[in-house]
């Protein structure tokens, strides 16, 4: 397996940008898909990127303190959906503030702080979905496992795509908004009529049994080059993963 350092560089360069200028660098997030099946890749955010004054992962993010966490949630969601195995370095799940130092322990107390604890729970939700849905790993090296819905919405810095496994019975739809601008009636194209069950979003995290996850019904109406579509209230830095 091969660490995908080129992807990591492009991903971090994009994530560090002021959201209002990300539209000029949209290709940094889409280029990696063009060669994602050529090797057995690991998408890694390594220790090399959180030392030597490069800043911790949370402090690479732009904006005010709360914005940093929202940005990182969006980034991690995109990373989860991107083909390739995943590797986060220690402390990146709860927003370690200091750079990595091999001589000291992580600042574990931060996990008890609201924003840090919320980020950790969100990452836990992402990993729960990763374990539960083979669509997120079984076809990393097969073009049938990934489909862009809209890779070209640079002006709004929104990405949407589908992950599939061999059965094509438990597909996942991802939507990621990388700006602080909410899209209250965001319409996304989909390939079929039916129910799209919301599994996770950036405001609630993972919807588990008893949470009453929302179900969106697609209807006939072309969008994003697809024959069906539905509308979803996409928040600032909004992320959403649907099962269909």
Where is each model-derived feature located?
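Active-site donor-binding segments of glycosyltransferases and PAPS-dependent sulfotransferases
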Residues: 5-13
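Glycoside hydrolase catalytic-domain groove-lining segments
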Residues: 17-48, 75-76
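Short, small-residue-biased leader/transition segments that mark boundaries at the very start
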Residues: 1-2
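Carbohydrate-interacting/catalytic domains
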Residues: 20-24, 48, 53-57, 63-88, ...
């Amino acid at each position: 397996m091969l660490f995908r350092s080129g992807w990591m560089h492009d991903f971090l360069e994009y994530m560090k940008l002021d959201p209002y200028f990300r539209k000029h660098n949209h290709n940094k997030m889409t280029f990696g898909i063009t060669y994602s099946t050529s090797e057995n890749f690991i998408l890694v955010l390594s220790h090399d990127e959180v030392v030597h004054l490069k800043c911790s992962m949370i402090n690479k993010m732009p904006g005010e303190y709360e914005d940093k966490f929202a940005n990182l949630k969006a980034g991690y969601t995109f990373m989860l959906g991107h083909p390739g195995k995943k590797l986060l370095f220690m402390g990146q799940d709860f927003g370690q503030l200091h750079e990595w130092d091999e001589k000291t322990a992580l600042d574990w107390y931060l996990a008890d702080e609201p924003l840090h604890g919320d980020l950790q729970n969100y990452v836990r939700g992402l990993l729960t979905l990763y374990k539960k849905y083979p669509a997120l790993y079984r076809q990393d090296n097969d073009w049938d496992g990934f489909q862009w819905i809209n890779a070209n919405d640079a002006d709004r810095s929104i990405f949407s795509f589908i992950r599939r496994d061999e059965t094509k019975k438990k597909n996942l739809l991802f939507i990621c908004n990388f700006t602080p601008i909410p899209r209250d009636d965001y319409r996304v194209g989909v390939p079929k009529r039916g129910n799209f069950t919301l599994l996770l979003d950036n405001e609630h995290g993972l919807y588990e049994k008893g949470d009453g996850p929302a179900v969106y019904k697609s209807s006939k109406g072309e969008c994003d080059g697809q024959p069906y579509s539905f509308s979803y209230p996409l928040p600032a830095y909004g992320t959403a993963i649907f099962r269909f």
